[in-house]
């Protein structure tokens, strides 16, 4: 993003396509951790403003689940993931029970904890700014103005707002544990399990 002297860390299912479009990048999605940019070009990584968008872990998880069920971006790996989910679960609750574990979320970027995209191994942020998906309509204009970015942000790939499925206390507890650092580091309250 040389034009804007910024590096956008695109965490899946967090309005990344909207930001990429606003910045004029139509080269496709590129979901890598912030450390990758640092290794590839340390000079620009230190010089440019680095930012990402985070989202409530449960809402992001449900969005990734729905997206995956539909075949994701249509790639072979996304189709295989859809088949795996469909053959091992029949709804979101059974997906949480049957598939959602540390191995699964580390194996599939759509489900990978957000902190792994933007934090160093000591959990310190490796970027300059964290924006929140839930507040993006309010946060983006001031952020864009400060960094000379396009002020309008057209939300694309946005799914209809649906109520999250009701889960059991054990399922909520599992999500809280798997995404503990996302809740802790980005200011989200863990899901009430009572």
Where are these regions (language model features)?
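Membrane-interface amphipathic segments in extracytoplasmic regions
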Residues: 1-194
